[in-house]
Amino acid sequence: MSAFSYTIMCNFAHNQLFLRMKKPLKRITIAVVSALLLLLVAGSFFMTTYALKAHSNRVEQQEDTWRIMSERYPDLKWWFDSVRQHRALNDTTIEMPSKYRAHAYYMRAPKPTTNTAIVVHGYKENALKMLHLAKMYSDWGYNVLLPDLYAHGLSEGEYIQMGWKDRFDVMRWSEVANDLFRSSTANSQQVLHGVSMGAATVMCVSGETTPSYVRCFVEDCGYTDVWSEFKSELKNQFSLPAFPLLYTSSWLTDLRWGWNFKEASPLEAVKRSTKPMLFIHGGNDSFVPTPMVYELYKAKKGVKKLLVVPNATHARSFAVANNDYKNTVKQFIEEQN
């Protein structure tokens, strides 16, 4: 056998061996990629369910809230007990344009007035968690409306909307509040006050065209956008980067519920806002990182004010600096009337 023929035979044998090895290698590669994709999809389903699934027993949660509020604000326990005993909170339920039943509590001022506060609760909480602020406004002679957001409290719904689609519901509640509290000669004069996700909600409302009776907004520890908030939580709670899980989870949320994490942006809404806004944040907030409030404040054009409470963690500014909180809010809203 010549050297040339031997070389040809060796090359042929090598190629055959390579082809035989290539097929299982290809199958292994496909299997690994498929497994990774399935794991990613499963992780995305878990994340969206973990982050957006409503409280499993919201009726039981309502009962617990009375106890929690009394423990959190012991100086106000007497008022909470009085409100409950005398049934000072009225219930109202309406059908939203999206065809779900939404619930709210409302309380009339001690004396007839058109001054009205709509106070919006936070993530996985309910309207009763805003009773401390309801008392604050009631003491100032305001009517108060406390809505349960979609998939919270006594409202229908299974998955949380992080304040984004909730903006339309709060705008509807604003109309309801005006019907409830306007006088025979004048509309109500409303302040929209939100805490945490509720703050994100009222900021999203501020970017829409609102009636003249909506006078101003107070946002307490709201986030810049859902993407940034979830990115922060992925890092802090799970030590995970944004890629790829946050991307696929946002896509899955869009597929299932028609919105994504980046478009749900209070920051972009604030840029469009034309009405006065008070920004409040805890100086030691790690859940919604404190630097977010500076970005929001900078983006707001027109009348604005900022209160950062030193040492306050998430949604604890009212408890940590009670007098400063109340004085700042009162002065701000009085300046808008």
Residue ranges and their predicted role:
Residues 273, 279-281, 285:
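Short beta-strand/loop motif that positions the catalytic acidic residue
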Residues 312-322:
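Catalytic histidine-centered segment of alpha/beta-hydrolase-like enzymes
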Residues 321-337:
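Catalytic active-site module of serine/aspartate enzymes centered on a nucleophile-bearing elbow/loop
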Residues 204-259:
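Hydrolase active-site cap/lid region
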Residues 275, 289-298:
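Short alpha-helix in the alpha/beta-hydrolase fold that links the catalytic acid
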Residues 137-156:
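Conserved alpha/beta-hydrolase
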Residues 160-181:
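Alpha/beta-hydrolase active-site loop
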Residues 37-95:
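An N-terminal hydrophobic leader/cap segment in hydrolases
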